[in-house]
Amino acid sequence: MESYLEENFGGVKAKNSSEEALRRWRKLCGVVKNPKRRFRFTANLDKRGEAQAIKHANHEKLRVAVLVSKAALQFIQGLSLRSEYVVPEEVKAAGFQICADELGSIVEGHDSKKLITHGGVTGIADKLATSPADGLSTAEESIKRRQDVYGLNKFTESEVRSFWVFVWEALQDTTLIILAVCAFVSLVVGIAMEGWPKGAHDGLGIVASILLVVFVTATSDYRQSLQFKDLDKEKKKIQVQVTRNGFRQRLSIYDLLPGDVVHLAIGDQVPADGLFISGFSLLINESSLTGESEPVVVNEDNPFLLSGTKVQDGSCKMLITTVGMRTQWGKLMATLSEGGDDETPLQVKLNGVATIIGKIGLFFAVITFIVLSQGLISKKYHEGLLLSWSGDDALEMLEHFAIAVTIVVVAVPEGLPLAVTLSLAFAMKKMMNDKALVRHLAACETMGSATTICSDKTGTLTTNHMTVVKACICGNIKEVNNPKNASDLCSELPETVVKTLLESIFNNTGGEVVIDQDGKYQILGTPTETALLEFALSLGGNFKAKRDETKIVKMEPFNSTKKRMCVVLKLPGGGCRAHCKGASEIVLAACDKFMDETGAVVPLDKTTADKLNGIIESFANEALRTLCLGYREMEEGFSVEEQIPLQGYTCIGIVGIKDPVRPGVRESVATCRSAGIMVRMVTGDNINTAKAIARECGILTEDGLAIEGPEFREKSLDELLKLIPKIQVMARSSPLDKHTLVKHLRTTFNEVVAVTGDGTNDAPALHEADIGLAMGIAGTEVAKESADVIILDDNFSTIVTVAKWGRSVYVNIQKFVQFQLTVNVVALLVNFSSACFTGNAPLTAVQLLWVNMIMDTLGALALATEPPNDDLMKREPVGRTGKFITNVMWRNILGQSFYQFIVMWYLQTQGKSMFGLDGPDAEVVLNTIIFNSFVFCQVFNEISSREMEKINVLRGILKNYVFLGVLTSTVVFQFIMVQFLGEFANTIPLTRLQWIASVLLGLIGMPISAIIKLLPVGSS
């Protein structure tokens, strides 16, 4: 079966499946009782096609708009323009001078002509009653007016479907519709023959069973849909930096309004349409909106920023002009919200299993109907009444047909793929509480098979709370882990050195020091920037004063490829100065001079360079991150178009930044090792820092290898194949190195790879990995969008929790499959064999519907929601080539099925003598005992299925309230059904002895199951 499934249903991958593969597997699902329900959570490929068409149209629209705008600009250069725009009265009344439609046409149409007629960006800001420096006012009445005129930054989403929609969908099950028709005919014929109410019992019994199945199914599906809706809302929560009332603050993108001033950096998503106010080296990736991969330069000449696009490089301040559904992104999102998620590989395989068993069930159902009908016809023939049919005969034939249809209901295990959805929804909800947000269903499933985790160091293995603890300035090494030490260092250094150092830190930064509403200093920026700015403040520096002294001419922000950040300043006395900071070895290699202890600039000879490199190494050996700062004097005529020089710098000093290892990381790494998961550290830091941290975390072992990115890049393919299995630490790595490592691990070594990432440049590796894990705090929006799971607390221990939940989902579904296939096999065999050999079926349509509900919805609820236990992390991972339906499962299924079938067959043939049954009700009593015993066999088999290999199946059962609730409700309802609903369920109240016997026959299944588990099975 496994090879058939792989061949026919294995084309769908956990990530990046082709559309052809997604369409193909659905066509292969031959027997589907309710397509609407079965395929509810699968991707809507038609909607995706619509989204692609919108992207293509956007691309064409933007291309035309830019061409028209350029042509118009050629005509209006130098002309004095007067706006002919008329402000609508309601906009004027609200205190604004421009309407939403006009703003939309300017930005979306890239209309430079209109922008100039409105006075450029500052003119638009005035008309929006806002300030490019201080942002808009937060007065409640002002915000309300703005919302009324321009709308909210929210997109139209598909409405939450009501409970009754799910009821209607559950009713569209083909087999239930056929049974409903049978019930209707049964009611009509029964009432005509026996009158009301006696003649209605059989028909009403089927109707009641159908309604019960429908309502339980609809309730389960409705709860799942609400869970997915909640998770979808979590995915869309994005915070941005905004200036309002002159103060910087973080705000949800849903609270943004036209007139807001937003600050963007590398990796951010543009939250709404708007205009560029100021910034440096801004490159925008518009592929999410237009499909065009070439980045666009945005500056004063091309100031248009479109919602949904991403900052690829640089930083800027933007003015929001258009929000929500008025933007192209809003329209695209409304379409994509109906696109759905791809079906996971496990769901697809289980659809295959359901199809195979469904076809077998259909075959047996037809044979059963033929055999039962043949028995009736044969009886009529022998009685000479073949042409004389009564209402009773019609009802009997109808009952045979209903039994055949119900065999299909039981035999087609549609609960299998739906159990995956139920289990994943349950796990995703619980993982949210454990600080992990699953973006793609398949990731939760794939994480259970992970064999390797490639983890970042900073913020994942470490706390990301950084402080400068050591500094080497002018050759003077000093501990600066408290304000007094920093003050002492400042007094020991020449004034010119302190001035240059503060100028470097305060200007060459992506961070900012602001005063909050309480009048206190607040440092904004990455943890590294924050540590440096805190250090500069402790030296007595004033951020605003230093920034006001000079003017920034050009800035090149830090990224993980260049590993440095540079800025060119225009000095107050004339001339320019470039400042550079970054990875110590790289910046020091760019220096040919240094500042000595007197503050004099002297040539950097080999001896001094070696000494400084030794200091870098000693800092790194103490697990400190090191940064080197340098500057270079330049000519006054430096132009923005010129490249900032890469050489000729003067070394100011080196700082050592402490980033402590997170508590619990060492234990989590040990847990991974015992679970057969190899943890590798991939970092941009110095190799000595990386090795020190890796040893502290327990990642780097005696036989492990630590390698630098540049060395890794130079290796030949043959050398890489020998090295990669041993690599535990990769330092000074570029995003491309990470991508190469992941690709080789996946393709050459067949590993299932999880990768963490936080930066924009990590997106390719996150995309390539089987499971991409983005950091929720330090991660950029680009990284989060490329990821499958977002680690909300940036903690490595959470990644281990995700792996544990992934394994739990996988094992829970295996348990459910084992349980359901057992019920399938036994129900099929009992009714088929009985029909063939005795001419009647002991399990009626109503009873089989009840069994189907125990098996499908309640069984899935009980077994697929079992929480994870620590034992899951003591077994080897399934890996890429592991079989889903294992030999252990086949052993348990066949063993338990054999026991149950023997019990049912014995009751069928010897039950009357065993219980001393005679008289007119003997047949009904026996069939009730068979039904009751069959249900209790499933109840105890459900308990046995909690463990596939272990004997102790009761461990932790009292903590699983869902499981206990399902078992209790099953037993209670079974009692009511047998004792009180006999007219509807074709049962008769049983004696105490008969109840004890039924329960005991089910209970014996547990020790039988334990004995079966002792039987050894091979791996093939």
Curated annotation (Swiss-Prot):
It catalyses: Ca(2+)(in) + ATP + H2O = Ca(2+)(out) + ADP + phosphate + H(+). Keywords: ATP-binding, Calcium, Calcium transport, Calmodulin-binding, Ion transport, Magnesium, Membrane, Metal-binding, Nucleotide-binding, Phosphoprotein, Translocase, Transmembrane, Transmembrane helix, Transport. One of its GO terms (cellular component) is intracellular membrane-bounded organelle. Residues 21-32 are annotated as: Interaction with calmodulin. GO terms for molecular function: ATP binding; ATP hydrolysis activity; calmodulin binding; metal ion binding; P-type calcium transporter activity. This magnesium-dependent enzyme catalyzes the hydrolysis of ATP coupled with the translocation of calcium from the cytosol out of the cell, into the endoplasmic reticulum, or into organelles. This is Calcium-transporting ATPase 10, plasma membrane-type.
